[in-house]
Design a protein with these regions (language model features):
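Amphipathic alpha-helical linker/stalk segments
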Residues: 62-91, 136-142
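Hydrophobic alpha-helical connector segments
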Residues: 77-108, 154-161, 190
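C-terminal peripheral helix-coil segments that are non-catalytic and often amphipathic
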Residues: 1-2, 98, 102, 130, ...
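All-alpha amphipathic helical-bundle segments outside canonical DNA-binding/catalytic cores
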Residues: 87, 124-127, 144-160
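N-terminal intrinsically disordered/low-complexity leader segments
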Residues: 1-13, 20
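Amphipathic alpha-helical segments used for helix-helix packing
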Residues: 101-123, 171-180
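Hydrophobic/aromatic residues within well-ordered alpha-helical segments
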Residues: 14, 57, 64, 68, ...
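Helix-turn-helix
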Residues: 13, 17, 25-59, 63
């Protein structure tokens, strides 16, 4: 392995470590309540090292949000991969539920940003996210024209999927309390995922 390749791999590993720590701390404290020193401590690195990779807190915050959205948009690639709506919607819901299970802090960072008026994401929502959503909407409308699904407002369908799947991350503490103070077991979470899939498919006659 060349020295250059090794440097690139080290950089990627360090950036991933910092982003994971930042996702957690931003989710807990919010943007204003977070200092880069808090993130550095969570990552187990000196603050100077953090700023070597991310010059400012704002840069880091934007990168965290970008990574979250990139993964969410990648989950919807099922709309292109699968020709049948049942397969596409099933895979999409499962991917979203898995993200909420594995990356609850990511979902909460996003929720905090939106609930605060999207000061950082505002322009991004009106461009990148809107373009992506419009592609999903066109696919859903095509399914309707082809009579593969019952008529449905594509925006309402997407919002319903987002609200339900992200609930398992954003309101995890509420679920724990209502579940007798225990996290949902892997088995129970799989059952919940299948139930959400069933409800989504049923909403469009599948």
């Amino acid at each position: 392995m060349s020295t250059q390749i090794r440097k690139i791999e080290i950089r990627k590993a360090n950036e991933a470590l910092i982003l994971e720590a930042a996702e957690k701390i931003f989710a807990i404290n919010g943007y204003k309540g977070t200092a880069t020193g808090d993130i550095a401590r969570e990552a187990g690195i000196p603050k100077a090292n953090l700023h070597y990779y991310f010059k400012t807190k704002s840069n880091l915050y934007r990168e965290v949000l970008k990574h979250i959205l990139d993964e969410w948009m990648a989950a919807a690639s099922t709309f292109d991969i699968y020709h049948e709506p049942e397969e596409a919607l099933r895979a999409y819901v499962k991917a979203k539920m898995e993200f909420s299970r594995q990356r609850p802090f990511g979902s909460r960072v996003w929720a905090r940003e939106i609930m605060s008026g999207a000061p950082v994401l505002h322009n991004f929502l009106g461009t990148t996210l809107k373009v992506w959503l419009n592609e999903c909407v066109r696919t859903i409308r095509r399914w309707t024209r082809e009579e593969k699904i019952d008529p449905v407002d594509p925006h309402v369908l997407m919002y319903m999927i987002w609200a339900t799947t992200q609930h398992y991350a954003d309101f995890e503490q509420q679920i724990i309390i209502l579940n007798g103070g225990k996290q949902l077991s892997d088995r129970r979470y799989r059952q919940s995922t299948e139930e959400v899939v069933r409800l989504v498919l049923g909403s469009v006659g599948l």
